[in-house]
């Protein structure tokens, strides 16, 4: 077994959910299920015991040694127009690392698991990281009632897969875990610009996501004076700029990712505007005040137009730090391979941020060509994928060998 196997597996997995030049493998879709079935066969072919837990997480277990397991993982669900590396490198790279240790004849002192967590992306049902939330024992009951654009609920899809929504709490397994490592593409330009081969993650930013509704008044686009309008889109514009200024001032990011306008006609002033908001920040102190900041900023921005504001917070995950000991182990593994490395934060959310508060956790990044992700143009060079597997395997061997 060689590290190059991960690139072969990435190409195979990309065939599930092919959509033109992109990958569309939404959580709980048929393409997602077919991909998990293929992955289960890969796990079993590598000598792992594969099983789908009550939350839809697929886990391959190398039942060796004793004590708590070291878990390597990420996700294989995707957004609507995705590339082939986001999440999948962490799962297939984890499998490749296990196969490297097996080929070397390593006999682990602890069990090793490879996990593909359910619905990390959250794009279909509007809430992310269901699988890792259930895995660590969070109450995910509210998630089950969420519906996609076609009106299908998570609970309905679970039943279609042969899973019982009432048993989702049985997916909790964190008490059996001693450490977690996640290999991932950077999804940004820092490593490539710096000419570095790997990034050792020091922490993951906190994230608040919300759905915002602004209500004004529909009226004639030609006969209503500008100073007599309650235009919901004008409120959106003011709010977007104000949120951007607040994010820049705090070293964070604010993104309005989707917008819906009613009634949506050339000749009618918009009566309603709904939009999604994603606000991220690295400081815990700043994060703790983020909900109030969003409320205050949006409401103040909409006052000049006399708009009614409704804000529903859909997700809130605080920033987390990575485990210093495993971070150092990853650095040593990179150094043994002669790889250039740098410490860096993660601006993206990952399953690791749910697991880090419970067990020692670390993440390893490899470069993203052009810093592009969540796009068919997403690309990580094959040699960087292979190097990531080698560094991961080196750290894993140090932890369990």
Label each residue range with its predicted role:
Residues 220, 224-249, 296, 366-401:
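His/Asp/Glu-rich mid-to-C-terminal helical/loop segments that flank catalytic regions of hydrolases
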Residues 119-120, 124-285:
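Midchain, well-structured core segments that form catalytic/ion-binding scaffolds
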Residues 1-29, 317, 372-374:
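N-terminal capping segment at the start of a domain
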Residues 18-63:
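A non-catalytic alpha/beta surface segment that caps or lines the substrate-entry region
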Residues 6-9, 14, 73-74, 341-391:
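Zn-dependent metallopeptidase/amidohydrolase metal-coordination segment
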Residues 24-28, 255-265, 276-283, 308-327:
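A short beta-alpha structural unit
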Residues 46, 54, 58-89:
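Catalytic-core environment of secreted peptidases
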Residues 80-150:
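A generic, well-ordered mixed alpha/beta core segment in the N-terminal half of proteins
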